[in-house]
Amino acid sequence: MTQQLNHAKVNQHPGQATLPETAEGQVRTYEVKTYGCQMNVHDSERLSGLLEEAGYVAAPEDATPDLVVFNTCAVRENADMRLYGTLGNLRSVKEKNPGMQIAVGGCLAQKDKDTVVKKAPWVDVVFGTHNIGSLPTLLQRAEHNAQAEVEIVDSLEQFPSVLPAKRESAYAGWVSVSVGCNNTCTFCIVPSLRGKEQDRRPGDILAEVQALVDQGVTEVTLLGQNVNAYGVNFVDPELERDRSAFSKLLRACGEIEGLERVRFTSPHPAEFTSDVIDAMAETPNICPQLHMPLQSGSDKVLKEMRRSYRSKKFLSILDEVRAKIPHASITTDIIVGFPGETEEDFQATLDVVKKARFTSAYTFQYSPRPGTPAAEYENQLPKEVVQERYERLMVVQEQVCEEENQKLIGTTVELLVQAGGGRKNDATKRMSGRARDGRLVHFAPEGDIDGEIRPGDFVTVTVTEAKPFFLIADSGVQTHRRTKAGDNSAVGQVPTTAPIGVGLGLPQIGAPKVAPATESACCSIN
């Protein structure tokens, strides 16, 4: 999964009379810094929701917040250095602002526990992946006791869906279907930090999706460490195990009016079944996009990784997907330099990459993570060997990406317009959007336009140029559809989702009842 840094946006809390205050009687502000994968991004939405429910408001840009929360990652080797380097920079800031608090959560906090405070004693709160709901209480306790509060629990206290959330996007939302993972990949530390897989009730998931759609969201990504294992470990003991539960969930999403795009990440090749592919092919709003982690093309390395599939099985899945969804875009994850990887093993990975024709690949150089079996393997590779293989893989994958993108020149695609400028925006004034298959397209915002194009609107364009990692559409906009999400984006309004309790959802698969329509003064859907 990709590394990224995200910041909370400004959102004024309506009930300021009850807000926590600084010593000067001012409202406390916060900033959440997120490192790591999509799971962390979504957890940070929950953290923002919790803090705003507790009375904090997000700090304006360039202002020093009263509270800084780090939601950390432990997957990559440099995660520790990034965190402690940033904490070191904050030490002097905190010394100049005595009332400032710093909290560290996420996977690195879960892993390091007491080490965080030993290395950075100016940190006020350390919390883990299983108790993010405790953050407001821990902050109060740290302030009252004038000492650091460290609370790491070994198992999930409550499913994150029971926590409020402040979403980052007006048009696209993450929805967790599960937490944790039951796989035992030898390179991965996530199961020891996130715990065993626990699956949400289908009705809770669909209710959250409906709540987002009611607020204008048109695209939802179903999120889990291994989404196609969904149904094996329901948190509700009354629900029976159902290995076809994920395909049923996808079809149920197809019944939700107003939900135009559904994506999911990430599946596991060993458990990816034909019923999911059929649901993708037969449900119109399921996007023709599949992220299928390869990790290695060598069967020997896959065995050492404990991945429980082989390259032939992997390629057969792609063949079935393309037979049923010919225009599907398939992306992947690849690790280079796993302990014991030979040149022959690496060539096997290159061979699979050439056969698989991935639209894009998240490629990582292996780094040993303490606490994982692979970190103890004796045959670790020299860094220069790993770097050289990584560079060769990037050349091959980049060529494949460009060749696949070249096939789309002259085709017309529908884009969900994204926030942020397009390629070389200052010179071209291009905007950016995502096609249904997930490809990034930079387009010229001119032509048949209904007023200003906003993030969250839909446009159709014709691809005029292809690059390895994006497409360009400079022939103008053919159609422009304004949306409620676009209206919300224009005024800086993002969705919020109220707590959805594990025990309150509907036990059966199926679209929830549609909530009564709500009118927005800024809504104009054409």
Swiss-Prot record:
It comes from the Bacteria. Residues 167-403 form the Radical SAM core domain. It is an enzyme of class 2 (transferase). Signal peptide: none annotated. Its main location: cytoplasm. CDD domains: Radical_SAM. Residues 1-24 are annotated as: Disordered. Disulfide bonds: none annotated. SMART domains: Elp3. Binds 2 [4Fe-4S] clusters. One cluster is coordinated with 3 cysteines and an exchangeable S-adenosyl-L-methionine. Residues 28-144 form the MTTase N-terminal domain. One of its GO terms (molecular function) is metal ion binding. Residues 406-477 form the TRAM domain. One of its GO terms (cellular component) is cytosol. Keywords: 4Fe-4S, Cytoplasm, Iron, Iron-sulfur, Metal-binding, S-adenosyl-L-methionine, Transferase, tRNA processing. Pfam families: Radical_SAM (PF04055), UPF0004 (PF00919). Its EC number is 2.8.4.3. Monomer. Belongs to the methylthiotransferase family. MiaB subfamily. This is tRNA-2-methylthio-N(6)-dimethylallyladenosine synthase.
